Amino acid sequence: MSEGESQTVVSSGSDPKVESSSLAPGLTSVSPPVTSTTSAASPEEEEESEDESEILEESPCGRWQKRREEVNQRNVPGIDSAYLAMDTEEGVEVVWNEVQFSERKNYKLQEEKVRAVFDNLIQLEHLNIVKFHKYWADVKENKARVIFITEYMSSGSLKQFLKKTKKNHKTMNEKAWKRWCTQILSALSYLHSCDPPIIHGNLTCDTIFIQHNGLIKIGSVAPDTINNHVKTCREEQKNLHFFAPEYGEVTNVTTAVDIYSFGMCALEMAVLEIQGNGESSYVPQEAISSAIQLLEDSLQREFIQKCLQSEPARRPTARELLFHPALFEVPSLKLLAAHCIVGHQHMIPENALEEITKNMDTSAVLAEIPAGPGREPVQTLYSQSPALELDKFLEDVRNGIYPLTAFGLPRPQQPQQEEVTSPVVPPSVKTPTPEPAEVETRKVVLMQCNIESVEEGVKHHLTLLLKLEDKLNRHLSCDLMPNESIPDLAAELVQLGFISEADQSRLTSLLEETLNKFNFTRNSTLNTATVTVSS
């Protein structure tokens, strides 16, 4: 949802320029003035650089801090301005995005739609989709804005990478093309499996990001779906060829528009660039047909042509494309084993691989595939799988570079509106009373509870380790009285925002089990009890 280009907003006495937006009714585009870069840094510029980290604003919960440095969002329609921000809980940079409403009444008319769309976006959890963290509304007397926090992508876009590759007179590696297509389709299949399906609607090589390790992430997942649940901005002529023919002709477009856009991305990835029509950058149909004919692989050509069918109903789904012969390969035992290890990594010590392999005979047989009569078995030696290479491969699998597509793909958790409190908060006057804790929505994947004796018969000490799904660890401790109510303690942790309401019953069971184990063992030589559970 963001690019790795940034610039500093300069404070001035003049008002920012306000332009009308062609997106949702009531939205305005605020374009603050920005600095231009010069070769020699003046004292004023040095001072501006020092001010980049200045905190301009904080989120209501205090976790997100907006900085002065603006992030370039030229390819993300619907976002009026975006700034670098700091996640004070994780200690990482994020993007502070703002959507402006020209009048407060325009926001009020769309408030429920805004909540529904953004509640859905927060639920999205996929390694190949830029993470959407949080949102809230800032409603004032005569205007309103919606602010949402997204993952900061410091890497460049796929378009930039393809341009560099062509400039260096290189061709696209077929394995890389397959790997990228698989990651993009895995993300699209995830979005399209939502109920109702989430249509990206703005998929181009400019809104796909590639990291240094080859990980692909699609960004700008429709913040302006508050209007039609799809992106409708077709301002930039250079990207018009990414939009399906039915755009603008039908009221309700389907997920097939994303398949058409993906097909165009796949073609551009294969040929590096589709030549436009002179300076206008407009890409005519003839140029697209010529680019397809340049493809030497007939399977690759057929794959792309299926995506670019003019009739939406004839285009395959993202799931079907993952099984097309141009992409699909039976997953190797190595890949299956890696996914199994990654899925149970909380049960495996960090240095387990190194400990297991350091004393092994590298000439020994690691695995063997038996063969028929008269044929030699196929053997894999330990020397063919060095520990460092395995560590790198496991890290790539963990990051989402090699998704498993032959099995059920991850499905999004559907938000339950009656249970999940909307993060939109109304404006309030600051008072000395403490604000209520932020509601926790992340799932706990690992819980560990330890109880030890402090004063015999008077009190015990409880320590709780919680590992959340985004790898955040919480370490909590308190004194536990003999007559303490375990359900009340679990409910208090929910109220304070340490765990989600969905994990309350699991935590209650863990606390009760640990306490029972402690009571059973404290008469022996042991004065402590520990229980661990994982989801």
UniProtKB/Swiss-Prot annotation:
Keyword DNA damage on entry: no
Any one GO CC term of the record: perinuclear region of cytoplasm
Phosphothreonine sites (modified residues): T431, T433
Protein name: Nuclear receptor-binding protein
Lineage summary: Eukaryota, Metazoa, Chordata, Craniata, Vertebrata
Family, similarity comment: Belongs to the protein kinase superfamily. Ser/Thr protein kinase family.
Gene3D superfamilies: Phosphorylase Kinase, domain 1, Transferase(Phosphotransferase) domain 1
Record's compositionally biased regions (Polar residues): 1-23
Keywords attached to this entry: Acetylation, Cell projection, Cytoplasm, Membrane, Phosphoprotein
Subunit: Homodimer. Binds to MLF1, recruiting a serine kinase which phosphorylates both itself and MLF1. Phosphorylated MLF1 binds to YWHAZ and is retained in the cytoplasm. Interacts with ELOC/TCEB1, ELOB/TCEB2, TSC22D2 and TSC22D4. Interacts with the Elongin BC E3 ubiquitin ligase complex via its interaction with ELOB/TCEB2 and ELOC/TCEB1. Interacts with SALL4.
